[in-house]
Amino acid sequence: MAARSAPSCHLRLEWVYGYRGHQCRNNLYYTAAKEIVYFVAGVGVVYSPREHRQKFFRGHSDDIISLALHPERVLVATGQVGKEPYICVWDSYTVQTVSVLKDVHTHGIACLAFDLDGQRLVSVGLDSKNAVCVWDWKRGRMLSMAPGHTDRIFDISWDLYQPNKLVSCGVKHIKFWSLCGNALTPKRGVFGKTGDLQTILCLACARDELTYSGALNGDIYVWKGINLIRTIQGAHTAGIFSMNSCEEGFATGGRDGCIRLWDLTFKPITVIDLRETEQGYKGLSVRSVCWRGDHILVGTQDSEIFEIVVHERNKPFLIMQGHCEGELWALAVHPTKPLAVTGSDDRSVRIWSLVDHALIARCNMEEPIRCAAVNVDGIHLALGMKDGSFTVLRVRDMTEVVHIKDRKEAIHELKYSPDGAYLAVGCNDSSVDIYGVAQRYKKVGECVGSLSFITHLDWSSDSRYLQTNDGSGKRLLYKMPGGKEVTSKEEIKGMHWASWTCVAGLEVNGIWPKYSDINDINSVDGNYVGQVLVTADDYGVVKLFRYPCLRKGAKFRKYIGHSAHVTNVRWSHDYQWVISIGGADHSVFQWKFIPERKLKDALHIAPQESLAESNSDESDSDLSDVPELDSEIEQETQLTYHRQVYKEDLPQLKEQCKEKQKSATSKRRERTPGTSIRLHFIHGYRGYDCRSNLFYTQIGEIVYHVAAVGVIYNRQQNTQRFYLGHDDDILCLAIHPLKDYVATGQVGRDPSIHVWDTETIKPLSILKGYHQYGICAVDFSADGKRLASVGIDDSHTIVLWDWKKGEKLSVTRGSKDKIFVVKMNPYVPDKLITAGIKHMKFWRRAGGGLIGKKGYVGTLGKNDTMMCAVYGWTEEMAFSGTSTGDVCIWRDVFLVKTVKAHDGPVFSMHALEKGFVTGGKDGMVALWDDSFERCLKTYAIKRADLAPGSKGLLLEDNPSIRAISLGHGHILVGTKNGEILEVDKSGPITLLVQGHMEGEVWGLATHPYLPICATVSDDKTLRIWDLSPSHCMLAVRKLKKGGRCCCFSPDGKALAVGLNDGSFLMANADTLEDLVSFHHRKDIISDIRFSPGSGKYLAVASHDSFVDIYNVTSSKRVGVCKGATSYITHIDWDSRGKLLQVNTGAKEQLFFEAPRGKRQTIPSVEVEKISWATWTSVLGLCCEGIWPVIGEVTEVTASCLTSDKMVLATGDDLGFVKLFRYPAKGKFGKFKKYVAHSTHVTNVRWTYDDSMLVTLGGADMSLMVWTNEVESHREKKYCDSEESDIDSEEDGGYDSDVTRENEISYTIRALSTNIRPMFGVKPHLQQKEPSVDERQGVVRGSRPPVSRAPPQPEKLQSNNVGKKKRPIEDLVLELAFGYRGRDCRNNVHYLNDGDDIIYHTASIGILHNVATGTQSFYQEHNDDILCLTVNQHPKFINIVATGQVGDSADMSATAPSVHIWDAVNKQTLSILRCSHSKGVCSVSFSATGKLLLSVGLDPEHTVTIWRWQEGAKIASRGGHNQRIFVAEFRPDSDTQFVSVGIKHVKFWTLAGRALLSKKGLLSSLEDARMQTMLAVAFGANNLTFTGTISGDVCVWKDHILCRVVARAHNGPVFAMYTTLRDGLIVTGGKERPSKEGGAVKLWDQELRRCRAFRLETGQVTDCVRSVCRGKGKILVGTRNSEIIEVGEKNAACNILVNGHVDGPIWGLATHPSRDFFLSAAEDGTVRLWDIADKKMLNKVNLGHAARTVCYSPEGDMVAIGMKNGEFIILLVSSLKIWGKKRDRRCAIHDIRFSPDSRYLAVGSSENSVDFYDLTLGPTLNRISYCKDIPSFVIQMDFSADSRHLQVSSGCYKRHVYEVPSGKHLVDHAAIDRITWATWTSILGDEVMGIWSRHAEKADVTCACVSHSGISLVTGDDFGMVKLYDFPCPEKFAKHKRFLGHSPHVTNIRFTSGDRHVVSAGGDDCSLFVWKCVHMPH
């Protein structure tokens, strides 16, 4: 028997030879204790050079590849590779885990770094995006994450001198990051001309924004900010792998084998060339360097660690060596000394001293070494090579004895015979050669039986036999030395083996798992003395088994540390140690063997010894000596709780089915029924698969659960209250230490835990996101702040929560076996225990993870299954109850004793003040003293002891006890049979509540005239229940078989019951005694019915597809109804008792005539006319509407019609009880729905007077009683929810503005494309025309300084001659004319008591001073702002949040985000990147100002709540499938908010981290319909007001509509504002101005009275988009981009801001001498703006869209070109039309006066330019035009002498024409000599440099050269304004860029004197005025 249990001895890791130098850098440091920390394989090593001792950190599961040291130098962070890699932060002193960071990275963790104070840790992943992640490591929480780079990142560091800044570097890049909120934003380092773009390998940050970095070519690059400022060339001659900074300066180490020390300013101090030292060698490469004081640590590529003392730097000290890169396979031990020999593919053979832990000899061979052996006398060492040769060396001086090559393939194994005479050599070519040692290794034999390569060899003790294993897993035996194969069984029996290293053979059967045929065990070695066997496998595991182990699947102890395959393992000669070697990690592990007798002492000496690793999970999957599992527990472990369809899947399923319904719902459907039901009482308690789920609350009520309901039972009044927040089975329940809150966990795909208040029955927090399938155990901590939960997924995940915040603190995989219970340590909140199938585990928290140890049973017992557990009186005492009836007592992790407590499992135990109480399967309750020494008292649960006041009857004596709890002088007991009992201390037992036992319940019947009902179940009982207030079970009877249906006779005296074996019986309804029984069918009887009236006939339906009709009086079968093709599900009689209606499983609705059973066909129209005695059918036209949209996945199982035939109740497979109006014609009827049952509802019945509805849950075994509440109009009781499966088909209303806003698609700046339909080759890709110089063959720069040729004329006429020309070096935004009102709302607010207003346009936030008109800007957004809100809390004064558009959801810089900033100083306080796509359309601060709500534009319209100061996302959930316009917090709340949108209003609550929502309920008002809602405001007492598309305002109380303010406005109500100080409400709508109405209204707090304000804008319709109220003023933003201030007293309007209504603004012209400019736009207006006065001076409505505008040279005339081809000339003085003309049919793109004012040039999209002579007067006759323009005209410029015109066209070509003839000029020399009056062309060699590399899809759209002729500004499709020098003929010229506009800058101009630049926006309809900053003289 013992052979299959794990051995009781133990291995302890003592030493690791090696250091990981390959593929890793910067992984070697000094700790504060002057120890050295590094890693190798999967082990972190702390080495003390003083004591020559190693400590090990073994918390990783795979190769460690990165390491960082905390600034205090005690803590270490390490990162590993793997599919789900994690980071451990651990203490280098205790080598215990402090925190585990996981669930974010994939592939591996490449770099780690702590910040200055060590609070945060940054990590970089190995995934394709090289994700960068910042952690709050103590809490195990991720703060921020962003894609790092498209290529590998090699190093990352925090800037230790600037907070929240990091630097990362890698392949061909360096990035400078800033962290703000949850946003990590990178800026790429600019290499510029200073150095080549190349790979940066390491970096260090210094003061003054300096960063030093080491490059691949050996240079050091020095950065200031993001720019490269200098390089230190040749710092190393090859790549610099490591850079370390310390107080004295910097140390660098490189591939050239040198260490360089630098001072703090990076001036060189010294060089140490390790290759030149005595330990050095050619090719030495430094991977890691650490400089501390006078010591330097160096790690090399070849796994050495050197320590250098600075003043003796030529004498480095070698403190660690290991094998270099290359697989390590060869291992042998010396036969007499404590030495081990290893040989590797690095071609070295090394000898290690196991005592001194040191390398004592090394020899390099010619070939890679694959195996080794030492002869018995220890003199010869044989090495087998990869090339098929073998070499023999003398051990003492490593000289060669012989080298033999007989084979061509690798030698895998060789062994000397025990007598030393022979050497056996096994090869890859399947042969074994035998050599004679004495004959100088002459070949004496050969074994050729194998068909595959040889893997292992062993000699027999007498050296006469050899056994081999080969690659196919075969074991063969040979006679020695000849090599004849041995097959005789007799001969084999007698062999004794000198060693056992074979993996195949009887003795080692047990090392293989039971059902596997894989060969992943690489090596074994038997220890005959200790009777143990050690194995090495491909998964990095070393295992100990008993030896011999004969039976497959033996138990073992396992040890991890190696990363991948362990290639070989051997005992040392005296069995003191085990040596194991790793193939890929090329490390050598030395383990100390601790025999059984020393185990106890050993455990106490070594604290870092974690037993969890040794006594592994797999090693005890099925110990043979564990007793059989108890039947009850076995049944329970087989429950899966999987669902075909989870409730979470319903929304998606509905979406998928949406298509089918479109057609179905065109008909107007019935409203929901007028009645509602309310859950009244539940008969049932879930005891059969749950434990300890029954408690007393603070006030003595009893809390438990059944189905999906949390029940609070009041035993005085016999009433129940219900928590109905769950939507599926509750599996566990725990009570808060104060006994007022309860936590319940449910089944689900992503199951949730609800923490709720037993008094108010409101949820306090909902926890989800970390479990799967369900939650089987929960427990509160002693302080009540934390909660532990266990899931039922395969690894039984354990999660620790801060439940109030809803935050996960830690998570870990619990165990492969089922966990039954979790308990938190009442004394140490970071500790907990879990217990379950064959295990007890003790856990402690470590950051985001938990570290577990298995309970250590020792010799006291065996690993039993634990059913319950509690903590005792000190933190290390724990008690657990087992499946065999014992109680185990634990101290720390050790079992100290067991006490027999019950017969059969102990299911529940509870700690009391002075002792314990236990309950078991034997039906006994036992009270114990405080040390479990003696049992004080036992109570048996027996029928005899039932007290008279019991509410029901005990089914049997001694039911299995599943839950037990004490309080109020009583013991509360819950049984497996579904009973809840109260045991008085003196003995009497009161039964309080009961239900059916395990087994489905289907049969239900209500009595014809009494409030009682009968149920029958698969639990083989028939029960009668009292539905009157006594709520008890009146009678019960056991049946021989389970039953599925029952029915009372019409007189109520008899009860018919159908059983599952095809029989049925009739019983006396009072005594339940048999009257008569029949057995005519084989299958289940599914329905049974007495005919109405006298009850003469009984119809019995079965799954045999027949209905039998019996005559009751004669007890004879009189008819059979045949013809059904499937089993019968429901039957009903008509009221005459003549006709039967039948439903079948094939969805047939059939009719039969009684009593003979003849089938009738009845047209569906007629069916309605028939009067039915009962209706329980689910088929037919009358109930078509009860089938849901997702009918494929769910069946309607039951229905029942009220006697007044008004309301049909149904039950379905998803546990919903629904009420429909009858008849429910038309598909997908509207209904009221109730969730309480968990899975299928099997039956529903109204009582005889319709006062109650009784429903049965199939699998939840509960009988629920609901009261019918017919609503009166005064008293509105609302139901759980009122819905239909699809959105109401009624139209939500129509309005053009709403439709536009809903359908708008926002362009992302980065994805912007051409605004003009350009075609052709871009200028920077065209073949360049040669210049004059080039044509003349002049080499550039070689033209003589003095030349006879006339000087080239100026390109541009300079207008400000006389002044020195000063180039412009910067542009500063000074004014923005524009406001985004067209598709945003509530985005204008007062600040500073109404002195300033804040609003936005394009991507800038604008603070505008009301008195002076001055503006300041927030310019940190990188794309359009869509929403803005102001924090109202006095603590957060002037704090603004703005949300922007974005594309991706990968959290990179282009993701949608919210910025929170200070409006006064424009400081960004936080950036919140959203993980959804498209953009953020609404933001709102909570009452305390600490939370922010944001709504996304993604298809789900995600609603997210943030703690904005930390950048933490608290909760997030899809809001609605259609557009949400606004969501706002209630002004007095941090948890309630309301969202409104297209046909949508939802009332939300934040509970912990979960968002719960309720739809607005309309049914309370007769003809209310769900309209599109546009705005929201709030009143006291939970009142909410929503503005609708029709102009009504809806008033809601909680979530129920209570009144409608009809026509509050005549058009949509777009904006509402709640004034906090007085509660008054402002509304803004869209309406035509009228006498009494107005687009803005001010209302009282209840929205009963109002005052209207008219906006005197002169518009036909005013459309208000934003309202805000200050002191005596109302601030209004309109659709027409005006911001108006209205006085409350005098109603006077003051327009503060004007802007164009619609864009693009194509036309822009600046006045020739004054600071004025004109703009012309698609909205049909031309506007005149004054820069000095900061306002619009005038506007002209043209009635058509305008495209271009131009001043005459004197500034007295204006020419305007229209979109329809017309152009107009106005006189500036009077704005009168001087002339107009329309010679073209399509848009005029540019219009220009010639500099001499004589000609007007008009360029159009008809590929033409027309010339008009203005001297001929206002008739405007065309004098000529330019032909042959290949595409539409974009821009035109006149020459200074008015004789030429340059034209840019839509095919990227520039042409020059003569004026006025229109002749095309092609002579390049002539063109080069023209001086231009203006330059606005985007084409031409002079502006080649403005075209950027990144313009595949987007273009430069406009340009303008300054009047001084030396600066150039451009605008482009990306919305950027760029400043260049002019001319800029070089491609990709240097420039400065200025953001602010939305995509498409349409025009740009300098004002006179180059004082300002004006830019016009396309998408944003805004005009920006930039101040020019000139370079000083």
Curated annotation (Swiss-Prot):
WD repeats lie at residues 59-100, 104-145, 148-187, 195-233, 235-273, 280-321, 323-362, 406-445, 449-488, 561-601, 725-766, 770-811, 814-853, 861-900, 901-940, 996-1035, 1038-1077, 1080-1120, 1236-1276, 1420-1471, 1475-1516, 1519-1558, 1568-1606, 1608-1654, 1699-1739, 1741-1782, 1783-1822, 1895-1934, 1940-1977. Keywords: Cytoplasm, Cytoskeleton, Microtubule, Repeat, WD repeat. The keyword Magnesium does not apply. Gene3D superfamilies: YVTN repeat-like/Quinoprotein amine dehydrogenase. Residues 609-629, 1276-1297, 1323-1363 are annotated as: Disordered. Pfam families: Beta-prop_EML, Beta-prop_EML_2, HELP. GO terms for cellular component: cytoplasm; microtubule. It comes from the Eukaryota. Residues 1326-1337 have a biased composition (Basic and acidic residues). Residues 615-629, 1281-1294 have a biased composition (Acidic residues). It is found in: Cytoplasm, Cytoskeleton. Belongs to the WD repeat EMAP family. May modify the assembly dynamics of microtubules, such that microtubules are slightly longer, but more dynamic. This is Echinoderm microtubule-associated protein-like 5. It comes from Mus musculus (Mouse).
